[in-house]
Amino acid sequence: MQRPITRRNFLGRCGRSLSICASSTLFPLGTVSRSARSAAIEKGFIGHKRSPYFKPLDNQMIRCTLCPHACEVGPSERGLCGVRENIKGQYYSLVYANPCAVQIDPIEKKPFYHVLPASRAFSLATAGCNFDCKFCQNWEISQAQPDDTYNYRLSPEQVISSALQYKSEVIASTYVEPVTFIEYMLEIGRFAKSQPLLKVMHSNGFINEQPLEDLCDVLDAACIDLKGFTEDFYRTMTGGSLAPVLNTLKILKSRQVHTEIVNLMVPGKNDDLQKVRAMCQWIHTELGPDIPLHFSRFYPRYKLKSIPPTPVSTLEKAREVAEDEGLRFVYVGNVPEHPGGHTYCPHCEKMLIRRIGYRIKVQGLNDGKCQNCGRVIAGIWKSH
């Protein structure tokens, strides 16, 4: 068995300048003594990087052009995400090379089911988010500012070298909304181009077109949360809106970025099967039948602790609706050992990938094709 990575040996291998994440839930890779921890971390370290995504206004005001919130920000103030600041009429990212969470995950945890099965994803996040989802699972860092978290100093070059050192095939921007640290993502992606590493993100898709086009230049795959299918749900449950997310999905398709969709089903909020059907019809029409769709089980957390977990039967009914609408790769997520977590050939129905938790067995797939009937299966099955 491979020895697990601890915080101490990670820091030792990656360089003494790294610091450590405040949230143990995102870095459960071992323990470290208090004295070592105090030497390893730095609270509130802010990595300034001028952003190209803003428009100057009068009186040193600026308008952010990164996401549809279009924040107008005065001098020494920050945008809604809390990680971008107007410094004398220029807009700066405060989280460049400054992640507060670093972990090596199975790629299926993102979740990506059609990208290098059983591969290792070097995963990272900074503080901040441009949504305030009432059901957020990582709210301790997504709703924090970089002043409040314990952070690494981890340059894009160090990200690449660390990912390779730990035999990762993928670098994943995840846990919070990676759009808020886009400058960091872009640089990591550019360095990764010359290495045998895929670059992926798990995003809410709430981003303007030009920044998204820039990301498409460096992304291999994107997992997008389609959190609901009404503007009312987005407004009341996330603080965002639906239309920009749908536009993001269409742009990703046009740019041929492999995309998977996650729909977290919250009881009484977005689990109406008629709306699920409308969503699946839109996906089929606009994105095609082969896009993987994950119906994920909700568990009580953050501001929705009084709502019970999603009944498994609800997820199963949603999966039936999606398949009835012609979607070919529909999954039940957050339900360990559920048969809806396996991948089947849509032509001959043979099982191609068996998933029991994070134990993955590729048993009927060869070079991206079903071994039984030869049907091409959408996805990324080889690294660069």
Regions found by a protein language model. Give the residues of each.
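Conserved AdoMet/S-adenosylmethionine-binding subsite of the radical SAM
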Residues: 153-313, 318-321
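Short linker/helix segments within small regulatory modules
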Residues: 75, 358-366
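Short cysteine-rich clusters marking metal-coordination/redox-active sites
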Residues: 64-67, 133, 345-348, 370-373
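Cys/His-rich metal-chelating microdomains
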Residues: 70, 74, 84-87, 132, ...
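N-terminal pre-triad scaffold of radical SAM enzymes
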Residues: 61-73, 107-134
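Short, non-ligating residues that shape and space the ligands of small metal-coordination modules
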Residues: 73, 142-143, 354-355, 379-380
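N-terminal secretory signal peptides and thylakoid transit peptides that target proteins
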Residues: 1-21
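C-terminal segment of N-terminal export signals and the immediately downstream linker at the start
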Residues: 4, 25-70
